[in-house]
Design a protein with these regions (language model features):
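Core nucleotide-handling region used for phosphoryl-transfer chemistry
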Residues: 1-5, 9-287
Length: 287
C-alpha cells in the first residue's frame, strides 16, 4: 500500500503513533481517534501494538497515494504485536481482534498454497491494473519468511514521486525498482513495449527535469502538502517534529473548516537544489 507505516501503542495512560524511525508522529497521533476506538482497544489490550499504514493525499510525508483514497487519509491495519517482545500475534487471532474492535485493515485475500500460482497471478495483474502496490504473503507458521510482491506500476509511481529529489535517495532505491519492474514484466510474459518504456522513462526523467530547470533558474525545489488535524496545538507539535527530523518545512496557511484544522505547508528540498546548482555552475563531480 502506498502510504507510511505506523506503530500504535499505549504508553502509560496515552496512546501514540510511532513512525518507522521510532519518532512519535504528532499528525498520526492526532488522527488516531478517527480510525478506530483506540480507548476501548488499548484499555482491554494494553500489552499490544497495532501496526498499519496511513495512506491518502493529505498526509505530511508521502506524495504517493492509493487510488481508493481520494481525500484526507485512512488507516489500514496489517499486524498486531506484543510490546517488549518480538512476538507477532498469529494471523487468525489477529483477524479476530481486527473484527472485534472494528479496526480497518488492508484487503485480505485468504489462504493460498504453491498450487494457487495462477490465481495469485490474476490478483497481481488486477492490482497492477488498478494502481495498487502489490501483495504481502504472510506465513501461517510464524518461523517461515514473509514475502512482499510489488507491481510494475508501483515501481514507476515510487520513482515518479521521488526522482525530483533523486540526489537525496540512495542509488539502490531506484535500481531496485527498475529491476522489480523488469522482473514483473518477465514473470507475466509481458512485452518490453513503448508503453512500458515511456512509463519508466517519464517516471525517472520528467520530475528530475523539472527540478533541474528550477535549480538552474535559481528557484528553490519544493514539495507542497495539505493535512487535516483535530487539535490546533498539534500543528505546532508537527512542525517541532519536522525540525527534530531536520525537515525544512514552512507553514503556508491554517484554517478551521468544520471539525478539522486544514493546514498547508511547503518542504524546501535544499539538498537537491544545492547539488544540482553546483553541477549546473560547473563544479566537477566524479562517477
Amino acid at each position: 500500500m502506498d502510504g507510511y507505516n505506523v506503530r500504535i501503542a499505549k504508553i502509560e495512560d496515552r496512546v501514540f503513533a510511532f513512525t518507522r524511525g521510532s519518532y512519535v508522529c504528532p499528525f498520526s497521533t492526532d488522527r488516531l481517534v478517527d480510525f478506530f476506538d483506540i480507548g476501548k482497544f488499548f484499555d482491554e489490550n494494553p500489552e499490544l501494538i497495532v501496526c498499519g499504514e496511513i495512506a491518502g493525499p493529505e498526509n505530511p510525508y508521502n506524495k504517493e497515494t492509493p487510488p481508493y483514497v481520494t481525500e484526507d487519509v485512512r488507516f489500514f491495519a496489517f499486524d498486531i504485536r506484543t510490546k517488549d517482545t518480538d512476538r507477532q500475534i498469529p494471523i487468525e487471532e489477529r483477524y479476530e481482534l481486527f473484527d472485534k474492535y472494528k479496526i480497518p485493515t488492508v484487503t485480505r485475500f485468504g489462504k493460498y498454497t504453491t498450487s494457487d500460482i495462477k490465481k495469485l497471478k490474476q490478483h497481481i495483474c488486477e492490482l497492477n491494473k488498478n494502481g495498487c502496490e502489490g501483495l504481502v504473503f504472510k506465513p501461517t507458521d510464524p518461523p517461515e519468511r514473509m514475502v512482499k510482491y510489488v507491481t510494475a506500476g508501483s515501481c514507476f509511481r515510487d520513482m515518479g514521486v521521488t526522482s525530483h529529489v533523486m540526489v537525496e535517495y540512495p542509488a539502490e532505491f531506484f535500481k531496485h525498482r527498475m529491476l522489480r519492474a523488469l522482473f514483473y514484466l518477465l514473470e507475466h510474459n509481458a512485452p518490453l513495449d513503448k508503453t512500458f518504456l515511456k512509463e519508466a522513462g517519464e517516471s525517472l526523467l520528467h520530475p528530475l527535469y523539472e527540478s533541474v530547470k528550477k535549480a538552474a533558474n535559481g528557484e528553490m525545489i519544493t514539495e507542497e502538502f495539505k493535512v487535516r488535524l483535530n487539535k490546533e496545538a498539534n500543528i505546532k507539535k508537527l512542525f517541532e517534529h519536522f525540525h527534530k527530523c531536520k525537515v525544512d518545512a514552512n507553514l503556508v496557511s491554517k484554517k478551521k473548516v468544520g471539525r478539522y484544522w486544514h493546514v498547508e505547508f511547503v518542504r524546501r528540498c535544499f539538498p537537491s537544489y544545492e547539488v544540482i546548482q553546483k553541477h549546473w555552475s560547473g563544479h566537477s563531480h566524479f562517477d
